[in-house]
Amino acid sequence: MTASVLVGAAARLPLVTAELDALLRQVAQRDAEAFAAFYDQTRARVYGLITRVLRDPGYSEETTQDVYLQVWRNAAGYDPSVGSALSWLLTLAHRRAVDRVRSEQAASTRESRYGAISVDPPSDHVADDVLLDDERRRVAGCLDSLTDVQRECIQLAYYDGLTYAQVADRLAANLATIKSRMRDGIRALRKCLGVA
């Protein structure tokens, strides 16, 4: 790099910082256009940071989405006297990624412990089969009571083993929409099955 390029980049840095600070203050006022501009200018850095921590593209996409949702909800909590908008955002992203790693590790540890200490007692296979058949019929009946889009989302996720992001890709729908359909569908299934 030449010295003039470095000087030009250094001169642009305060402008970018000031621009992001201004955009984040507008986001705090629920300005959707400012949020879109803030997202466009920062998404690559946020996703890159999260991917370096998580090392999984699917979790990274989901965590990035969570970070920007948190930005939208908590932009008013940004204090420019403490640091720049970019450092606030990257700190938020790093914390969220580390939380995700800890959560996954805790879940893995719980599963390992449970698997190590749980021993299946002898059972009556005929009675178990009858109960399973009855439960399958109840679940199938309750699935039929869902809307077509809810049923399709649940079948893709639970019967075909797809992640929410893969379901969104398959159905060409927004991930937030898929999550909403899944939540509503599961709620309806619980109600139908009499599960709290």
Curated annotation (Swiss-Prot):
Residues 164-183 bind DNA. GO terms for biological process: DNA-templated transcription initiation. Pfam families: Sigma70_r2, Sigma70_r4. Keywords: DNA-binding, Sigma factor, Transcription, Transcription regulation. Belongs to the sigma-70 factor family. ECF subfamily. The sigma-70 factor domain-2 mediates sequence-specific interaction with the -10 element in promoter DNA, and plays an important role in melting the double-stranded DNA and the formation of the transcription bubble. The sigma-70 factor domain-2 mediates interaction with the RNA polymerase subunits RpoB and RpoC. The sigma-70 factor domain-4 contains a helix-turn-helix (H-T-H) motif that mediates interaction with the -35 element in promoter DNA. The domain also mediates interaction with the RNA polymerase subunit RpoA. Interactions between sigma-70 factor domain-4 and anti-sigma factors prevents interaction of sigma factors with the RNA polymerase catalytic core. This is ECF RNA polymerase sigma factor SigK. It comes from Mycolicibacterium vanbaalenii (strain DSM 7251 / JCM 13017 / BCRC 16820 / KCTC 9966 / NRRL B-24157 / PYR-1) (Mycobacterium vanbaalenii).
